[in-house]
Amino acid sequence: MNVIKISPRGYCYGVVDAMVIAKNAALDKSLPRPIYILGMIVHNKHVTDAFEKEGIYTLDGPNRLEILNQVDKGTVIFTAHGVSPEVRKIAEDKGLVAIDATCPDVTKTHDLIRKMKAEGYHVIYIGKKGHPEPEGAVGVAPDIVHLVETEEDVERLDIEAEKLIVTNQTTMSQWDVHDIMEKVKEKYPDVEFHQEICLATQVRQEAVSEQAKKADLTIVVGDPKSNNSNRLAQVSEEIAGTKAYRIGDLSELKLEWLDGVETVAVTAGASTPTPITKEVIRFLEQFDHEDPSTWKISHEVPLHKILPKVKAKT
């Protein structure tokens, strides 16, 4: 089968940095145990499973505060999505060692919110409700940050502040953000704009919007909790006009999706391990509609291949 390997795809620098930070923590014998990650370090189950094998445990829950309530000792790692100042303070009050793996692009948004609050602004924040990145951002200044996910949410806003700025979750689709920002401008004509689509997210979305046009089908390799992976599938369908499916790994690929397909495009979310994507590409490249011997789907990437290699400190 013809395979278009969409480029760029896969890991971004923020994800790699977060994984290296966590891997170094696993190797650092001076850190108090146990070591916990507050939520998924990045939104990919293969990564969290691999870290558990390294002795780093992922804790889950509806929000970071409730997750932190599960921890009474040891070390906590804040994920790439960032956390609120309240979470940091509680971790400190509990006497926990805290390691920060927040993506620098997320930190920029937190800094912006602090600056805007100091200058008397209210902030409209476009993001996905229930996602940890907006949770952390809103938590920076909950009294002046208003979370919206849809144009309908914008219509329900009732903000009387004279100074208003709109920003967004870094992994949103730039097209989604544009439409919601236009709605904000319609309701609040004097609003200021500060779009925060991270460059890695933007170039991956743009690559899909152009390169997927040449395919009959797009396969996005990414975890169901990965917002940027889900957005890539959305971009393929809504912008490139190409049907898309998101899969966690090769085991989730359905052969019936390939019926009548001559060319398939493959991309991956920013938190998807490269070996997982390569396995999908290899299968599709050898797949032949006429040869049943090429139809067997078998996911075989071992956990020790998932994490970046880091040298132990001497």
Swiss-Prot record:
A GO term, aspect molecular function: metal ion binding
Domain of life, source organism: Bacteria
InterPro entries (alphabetical): LytB/IspH
Binding site for isopentenyl diphosphate: 43, 81, 131, 226, 228, 271
Known pathway: Isoprenoid biosynthesis; dimethylallyl diphosphate biosynthesis; dimethylallyl diphosphate from (2E)-4-hydroxy-3-methylbutenyl diphosphate: step 1/1; Isoprenoid biosynthesis; isopentenyl diphosphate biosynthesis via DXP pathway; isopentenyl diphosphate from 1-deoxy-D-xylulose 5-phosphate: step 6/6
Catalytic activity: isopentenyl diphosphate + 2 oxidized [2Fe-2S]-[ferredoxin] + H2O = (2E)-4-hydroxy-3-methylbut-2-enyl diphosphate + 2 reduced [2Fe-2S]-[ferredoxin] + 2 H(+); dimethylallyl diphosphate + 2 oxidized [2Fe-2S]-[ferredoxin] + H2O = (2E)-4-hydroxy-3-methylbut-2-enyl diphosphate + 2 reduced [2Fe-2S]-[ferredoxin] + 2 H(+)
Keywords (A to Z) from UniProt: 4Fe-4S, Iron, Iron-sulfur, Isoprene biosynthesis, Metal-binding, Oxidoreductase
Gene3D superfamilies: 3.40.50.11270, 4-hydroxy-3-methylbut-2-enyl diphosphate reductase, catalytic domain
Cofactor(s) needed by this chain: [4Fe-4S] cluster
Residue positions binding dimethylallyl diphosphate: 43, 81, 131, 226, 228, 271
Pfam families per record: LYTB
CDD domains the record matches: lytB_ispH
Top EC class, one word: oxidoreductase
NCBIfam families for this protein: ispH_lytB, PRK01045.1-1
Protein name as catalogued: 4-hydroxy-3-methylbut-2-enyl diphosphate reductase
Organism annotation: Bacillus licheniformis (strain ATCC 14580 / DSM 13 / JCM 2505 / CCUG 7422 / NBRC 12200 / NCIMB 9375 / NCTC 10341 / NRRL NRS-1264 / Gibson 46)
